[in-house]
Amino acid sequence: FTIGITKGRWNTLVTELQQFKDDCDSNQPLWRVLPEFVARHPSYERVGLRDLCAQIHAKYKEHDIARLTTEMYLSNMEPAMKPSEAFARMAHREIDRVPIDQLEGRITAMLVTPYPPGIPLLIPGERFNSTIVRYLKFARDFNHLFPGFETDIHGLVSESIAGGGTRYYVDCVKPSRTAGGG
């Protein structure tokens, strides 16, 4: 299925986009526009669609996500080992599950791919830099503020913690005793 590939699908897409715009312009309550979503996330029951869009936009603007997502793909990627070596280390369970706040300088054992755009950001064997860590911190904080609208990042592992909340990790190569880092 590809959106808008035929005239019929194109018309459906345009109709749905127009309906979304109308609902946004009139600030329809989310319980009316997305009833199944609100049933799963009742905290949005009294929120209007335009209000939610404005809150999400403000958070993206506050963190200059358009610039950050460009910078992270253009940032200096430091290969620390061959991808095959990182995979072998993972296969032999020579990995640590590292929290986001401790990732800078660590070597990923996983492919790290944010969606969108679905382009790999790091491949196994590359080091996390401060720009990538800043993006992952934003994603973690955004996910906490807007449950149900979580950022999808392949390679970022989430675990529920007792008492509510979520912690995020990436599997990294264990530091070698003889080499400089992991």
Each model region followed by its residue ranges:
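Non-catalytic terminal extensions of PLP-dependent enzymes
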Residues: 2-182
